[in-house]
Amino acid sequence: MTYLLRRAELEDLPEMIRHESEIFGHDAWSPELMVAEVSHPMSYYLVARSAETKEFAGYAGLRAAVTGGEGGDIQTIATLAQHRGKGLGRTLLRALLEEARNRRVQDIFLEVRADNPTALVLYESEGFAVIDRREGYYQPDGVAALVMRRHDEGPQGGWTQ
């Protein structure tokens, strides 16, 4: 399946908020947090739609200094259930990594639930490595978070672990 990605705008927030709890359940961000995150000057959020049907398919976000710096964070990658397993998560992740590269960010971090093997395999296949484990991070179920990092040596060096 082919997806169209574009920069998220404040007008996209109602749809993003509507799907947040559907995708993440009790780990969902509050509407207020999502508004603050998407409108933050260091945030870069994308929305994805099916190229064929124009149906909302997901969204993803990065937070990193626009002028570069040592670190940035993948804040979220969210795909609707009917679009999982079709390459959308990878497409969104690669688009965020490209933006991080454009911002000259050297280290990209993310957190993933330890009980989410699908996401873990995706991140590892894109060069992320586990660097820490935070026990009991996700509440109320007490699931650990795995902190992952991907390092870029710079414009000439490419991405490395």
Question: Where would I find each of the regions flagged by the language model?
Answer:
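Conserved GNAT acetyl-CoA-binding A-motif
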Residues: A100-E111, R134
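Short glycine/proline-centered loop/turn elements that form peptide/ligand docking sites
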Residues: G89, L93, N116-A119, G136-D141
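Conserved hydrophobic/aromatic "anchor" residues
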Residues: F24, Y59, H83, L122, ...
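Short glycine-rich hinge loops at helix-strand junctions in the catalytic core
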Residues: G87, R104, G127
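Conserved catalytic-core motifs of GNAT/GCN5-like acyltransferases
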Residues: E111, E124, A129-L146
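Acetyl-CoA-dependent GNAT
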Residues: Y3, R7-R84, L93-E99, R103, ...
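Residue-level recognition of the GNAT/N-acetyltransferase active site
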Residues: L80, R84, E111-R113, P140
